[in-house]
Regions:
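Amphipathic, well-packed alpha-helical segments that form the structural scaffold of globular domains
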Residues: 15, 46-54, 75-79, 107-108, ...
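A conserved structural/catalytic subdomain of Rossmann-like adenosyl-cofactor enzymes
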Residues: 162, 167-636
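Conserved S-adenosyl-L-methionine
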Residues: 60, 64-170, 174-190, 248-250, ...
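Long recognition/docking surfaces used for binding and targeting
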Residues: 1-54
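Short glycine/proline-rich turn/loop motifs
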Residues: 51-58, 203-208
Length: 642
């Protein structure tokens, strides 16, 4: 407050003789009585100011002041299962502590259990200076040492790098960009922060150290990695560390296999850190109505929980408030005991009108899947065509602009258009065409225009010699073009001749597959499939290598337009799935096994979805009759006319 010139005005305000903040009744300068401010009154005022301040201050997406009933639930979830075996010193950490509610509520819970105040150490980080000041003030008011609260950025500043904690509770911001933060933890493309690097195995069991940062539009899972990084090793705390972290739905399923989000989920599941995930009711926060989920993590699971994850659906476990508080219109307080019971008992149960909390238990592998790429061969019909040859003059990356350049500047494109850049940019701006300077320089490059003109002229010479016959086999067409170019002594490279062939080709499902490469049986690609991936020799064709004669395989080029991917549960064999779900419908498909990635996602809708039963014919008939009575027989008369 002193740094921001606020301290003096605050002191003047609280010492105003017209305000009574003491515990004794008094009289103001005008002789009017000023009642004492009781402890209860002070607490009520403070909570209301906190709520209002946070509603106004948490304007950015994903920043939410956590209500007390949610904090209380998290405190119980963290400590209830281990309350009989707490360590002598309890270290509690919140990497996004806000106004400190998570920490102080957990402290109150521990005090109620009989834990000594001196045995509780609170730590936290908060990026917002005003909220940080409120957190420190709250702790001071409560007589708690505030030195463990740091002002800083949890993502960029690993301020507790030399510490670990036994218990962590947080509600980090979600759907909030961390684009600027990312620049500070990278040197060019190299990640500098070990917290966000994870060691995972690939499909063939090789360990890889992966950059597992999520997309820059949402950094919530980085806070979860921060907490995992700060877990106390079992040799320092045999009871293990426990984490309760609130996130929105994107933490469960956003990101394809191999993405940062998916890798984070994989790591947590494969390391068997996830005890449970609990879906909370909507509209329990003050400024958002989104679905939220509590991730419960520990590095010391009970034996019956090992290799398992419990999903708890508490979305219907709420009681409506008499009056809305912003977006908040309900409380989970009356159902806290039910949620705790289902969690601590580790039982499955169906939610219904009487039991508002549902629970299902899964194996860790139920959430992991193989993302398998399925390929189909590229089939091309080939024919020399004057129109296609003329099109070769233009840049294929932006034919329309390239055509405009040629139509406007004619043969000047071959000598350079640098002097015309301002006029070209003005045209592009008028047409609302957005092109980077790098791409524009490529489009006006005199060398590129000359190279394309040379290829176009070569194609005309080839067409004159080869003719316009249709080839349904690209391989024969390519062989013919290469042989003719050699006979005519055209100064064209193999890559340029391939460009000409492709320009004269279109996809055709009836054409012969395009051969990419021929392989001997001892080639590294074939050996890798046989030995590293364990593919049986008689099934190589299902993996893209077709036997054409003894000791020789042919590999077809894949058609990117027909490429597909399949999510196959890790409990299922990829080949069996392919034979059952793909082969019957696409005869020439194959598995691109080397591109296989392992992903992880958790879908509450999938596991707890309850379809709405269809209405019976009797119910529909009854409603139609009722409507007919309201319309004085009009509906019935329509049916009589039919």
């Amino acid at each position: 407050m002193a740094d921001n010139d606020r301290l003096l005005s605050i002191i003047e305000r609280i010492t105003d003789p017209r305000i009574n903040l003491t515990d004794k009744n008094t009289i103001d300068p005008d002789g009017l009585p000023l009642p004492a401010l009781t402890n209860v009154g002070m607490g009520t005022v403070f909570e209301e100011l906190l709520r209002r301040f946070n509603e106004e201050n948490n304007e950015e997406a994903g920043e939410h002041f956590t209500p007390r009933d949610a904090i209380s639930l998290l405190a119980h979830l963290v400590f209830e299962p281990v309350k009989e075996d707490l360590p002598k010193i309890i270290t509690l950490y919140d990497p996004a502590c806000g106004s400190g509610g998570m920490l102080t509520e957990s402290r109150e819970y521990l005090l109620d259990l009989g834990v000594r105040s001196a045995a509780i150490q609170l730590s936290g980080t908060e990026i917002n200076p005003e909220t940080y000041a409120i957190c420190k003030s709250d702790l001071i008011i409560k007589g708690v040492d505030p030195s463990g609260i740091h002002w800083g950025n949890t993502i960029t500043d690993n301020s507790f790098s030399d510490k670990s904690f036994g218990y962590m509770i947080t509600n980090p911001p979600y759907d909030k960009s961390w684009k600027e933060d990312k620049k500070k933890i990278y040197h060019e493309k190299m990640l500098l922060d070990h917290r966000f690097e994870l060691t995972l195995t690939n499909y063939i069991g090789e360990e890889e150290v992966l950059d597992s940062t999520p997309r820059t539009s949402d950094g919530q899972l980085l806070f979860l990695l921060e907490e995992v990084d700060k877990m106390k090793p079992l040799e320092f705390q045999p009871q293990g560390s426990r984490i309760a972290s609130i996130h929105n739905g994107s933490s469960l399923f956003t990101g394809d296999a191999g993405s940062g989000e998916s890798n984070i989920r994989r790591y947590l599941i494969e390391k068997d850190l996830v005890e449970a995930i609990i879906q909370l009711p909507n509209n329990i926060f003050y400024n958002t109505g989104i679905s939220t989920y509590v991730w419960m993590l520990t590095n010391k699971k009970k034996d019956n929980r090992k290799g398992k994850v419990q999903l708890i659906d508490a979305s219907q476990a709420f009681e409506k408030l008499r009056k809305n508080q912003g977006s908040r219109n309900c409380t989970i307080e009356p159902y806290r005991t039910d949620i705790l019971r289902v969690y601590t008992d580790f039982v499955e149960q169906e939610a219904n009108e009487e039991l508002k909390v549902g629970s299902k238990i899964f194996d860790d592998d139920d959430f992991r899947y193989y993302n398998v790429t399925i390929e189909c061969p590229l089939r091309l019909r080939c024919q020399f065509n004057s129109l296609k040859i003329d099109e070769m003059l233009y840049d294929s990356s932006d034919i329309e602009v390239s055509k405009w350049l040629y139509n406007t500047y004619k043969d000047r494109v071959f000598s350079g258009l640098d002097s015309e850049i301002p006029a070209i940019k003005e045209y592009l701006n008028d047409q609302e065409i957005k092109i980077t300077d790098k791409k524009l320089n490529k489009l006006i490059s005199a060398k590129a225009w000359k190279d394309r003109q040379r290829l176009m002229n070569a194609a005309k010479v080839l067409m004159k010699d080869i003719g316009t016959d249709v080839y349904m086999d690209y391989n024969l067409f390519s062989t013919k073009v290469n042989a003719t170019a050699k006979e005519l002594k055209l100064e064209t490279s193999a890559a340029e001749l391939k460009t000409i062939c492709r320009a004269m080709s279109v996809t055709d499902s009836k054409a012969t597959p395009v051969v990419k490469k021929e392989h001997k049986a001892n080639s590294k690609d074939v050996v890798m499939l046989l030995e590293t991936y364990g593919v049986p020799e008689d099934k190589l064709s299902d993996y893209g290598y077709h036997l054409v004669k003894k000791g020789m395989y042919v590999e077809f080029e894949s058609d990117s337009e027909l490429r597909d991917s399949e999510k196959i549960p890790v409990k299922e064999d990829i080949y069996d799935y392919f034979q059952r779900e793909v082969r019957p419908y696409v005869e020439d498909a194959w598995i691109n096994l080397t591109q296989t990635k392992i992903g992880c996602e958790i879908s509450f809708n999938k596991y707890f979805y309850k379809p709405t039963p269809l209405r019976s014919l009797k119910e529909n008939e009854r409603d139609i009759i009722a409507l007919d009575e309201q319309s004085q027989g009009y509906i019935k008369s329509l049916f009589e006319l039919m």
